[in-house]
């Protein structure tokens, strides 16, 4: 696996060394920095085109003192001894939930980002295709466009990826030009905000051209227990890229929180755990094959994007009883009896009173809303899936990315005159996928597929999490792909539980007549001007 190694001057290396566990590998931990600075670094990361260490030098280093010589970056000997006595002596896993670390993973493919983001109890910040252009080269070596490379994939793979990125690079200025003509700057729009919104529009329209091999940077903050589970899943994963990053994350965390990860390398602990994960995956694959479910049939695709409510659990009386439960002094059975005796009008008034006045979408009713549950099967483009997969407090399961479910060309790409190029990219992508799959590289073949290809996944979530997801993802500043999913989820919940749908007062169904990102960019511009 090839990845870029950034060059730093001697002075830059001296400034970086106290704060990063290494200066020449794509995975590293942050040390000797205030927690607020680590968080700010990761927050800025998503819109910064370069690496985290370069970001630190350009925007943070001048405002931070240089640590004193000999400052201890790791956990310290005494802490390690205490932890070993408690954790290994008493088996108290909860101790590993109370200490964490910030780790950056750079030059990771869009296939691997989904594996890295799978643990629920962690925080992630990923470089965004909405703010970063993918038309420039990586540092040399290896140079070239930003995609995952592996000699085992063959030279035909690199030729196909180069062609995809070439199409993207040539289309980008054309789509920007179309957007500027289609959405001229209004008098109340600052020029800088309008320019950023134009770029975001073009990036949004063309992100479906980018292959899943496209490289990104990601920041992770997690507790030791979450890192242990993440590393074991990576080491058990069939992709060499995942295994390599699992080892690198372990190496860096051993410099910062080694005691939390002491079980990973023990054959009778982490070794057996990883073997179990591998055996579990292989058993599922064998079962699918035995049942004749390992190949898509004619009924499975290509198909349009879709949202299907497979099933739901609970009724609105369950919701009212649960929302009242914490305030009453009786059994739930008595609460249900009282609720059942209410007429429809009184029931609606009670629910509105319990939900409260939600003047902000972040104001959500209490945990009683979790009494109802929904399971959705969704077919959407991989780009939309990437955004929806980031939600943590739900169950998400997804199938392998293949070309079987098809892909569409965005209407506005057609209007910009790039539709034929887009279709050619999809065909190149599909052909390379099939070539790799025919060589027995079915798992790695997903690298070749454009993000515009559709994937099937399931979201299983309660009504409270559904409210958070739908209201956030329905916003007019969001990408049209996941907005459509959020709107349809809301419609289907409203059909079975009208009262729940009515509680979601911040679902945005309006179309922004200007650029989707312009309002957010104008707010950012105003904040920057106020702080200047």
Residue ranges and their predicted role:
Residues 1-532:
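A conserved ligand/cofactor-binding region detector
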């Amino acid at each position: 696996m090839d990845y870029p190694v950034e060059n730093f001057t001697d002075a830059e290396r001296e400034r970086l060394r106290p704060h990063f566990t290494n200066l020449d590998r794509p995975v590293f931990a942050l040390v000797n920095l205030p927690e607020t600075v680590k968080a700010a670094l990761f927050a800025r990361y998503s819109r910064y085109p370069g690496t985290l260490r370069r970001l630190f030098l350009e925007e943070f280093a001048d405002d931070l003192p240089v640590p004193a010589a000999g400052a201890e970056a790791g956990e310290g000997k005494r802490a390690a001894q205490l932890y070993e006595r408690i954790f290994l002596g008493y088996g108290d896993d909860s101790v590993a939930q109370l200490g964490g670390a910030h780790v950056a993973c750079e030059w990771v493919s869009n296939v691997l980002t989904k594996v890295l983001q799978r643990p629920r109890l962690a925080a992630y910040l990923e470089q965004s295709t909405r703010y970063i252009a993918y038309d420039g080269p990586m540092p040399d070596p290896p140079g070239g466009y930003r995609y995952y490379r592996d000699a085992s994939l063959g030279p035909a793979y690199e030729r196909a990826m180069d062609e995809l990125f070439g199409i993207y690079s040539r289309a980008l200025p054309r789509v920007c030009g179309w957007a500027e003509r289609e959405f001229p700057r209004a008098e109340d729009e600052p020029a800088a905000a309008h320019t950023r919104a134009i770029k975001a529009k073009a990036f949004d329209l063309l992100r479906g051209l980018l292959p899943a091999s496209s490289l990104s940077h990601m920041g992770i903050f997690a507790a030791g227990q979450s890192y242990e589970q993440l590393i074991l899943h990576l080491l058990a994963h069939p992709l060499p890229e995942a295994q390599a990053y699992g080892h690198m994350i372990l190496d860096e965390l051993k410099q910062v929180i080694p005691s939390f990860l002491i079980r990973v390398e023990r054959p009778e602990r982490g070794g057996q755990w990883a073997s179990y994960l591998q055996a579990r995956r292989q058993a599922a694959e064998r079962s699918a094959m035995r049942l004749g479910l390992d190949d898509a049939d004619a009924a499975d695709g290509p198909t349009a994007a879709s949202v299907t409510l497979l099933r739901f659990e609970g009724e609105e009386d369950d919701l009212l009883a649960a929302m009242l439960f914490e305030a009453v002094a009786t059994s739930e059975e008595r609460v249900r009896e009282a609720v059942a005796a209410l007429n429809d009008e009184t029931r609606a008034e009670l629910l509105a009173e319990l939900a409260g006045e939600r003047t902000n979408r972040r104001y959500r009713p209490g945990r009683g809303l979790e009494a109802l549950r929904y399971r959705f099967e969704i077919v959407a483009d991989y780009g939309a899936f990437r955004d929806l997969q980031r939600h943590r407090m739900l169950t998400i399961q997804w199938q392998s990315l293949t070309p079987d479910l098809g892909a569409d060309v965005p209407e506005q790409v057609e209007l910009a005159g790039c539709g034929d190029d887009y279709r050619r990219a999809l065909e190149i992508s599909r052909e390379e996928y099939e070539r790799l799959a025919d060589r027995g590289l079915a798992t790695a073949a997903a690298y070749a597929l454009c993000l515009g290809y559709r994937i099937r996944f399931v979201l299983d979530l309660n009504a409270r999490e559904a409210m958070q997801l739908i209201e956030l993802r329905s916003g007019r500043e969001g990408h049209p792909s996941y907005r459509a999913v959020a709107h349809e989820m809301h419609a289907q919940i409203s059909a079975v539980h009208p009262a729940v749908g009515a509680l979601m007062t911040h679902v945005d169904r309006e179309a922004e007549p200007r650029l989707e990102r312009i309002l957010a960019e104008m707010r950012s511009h105003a904040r920057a001007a106020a702080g200047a």
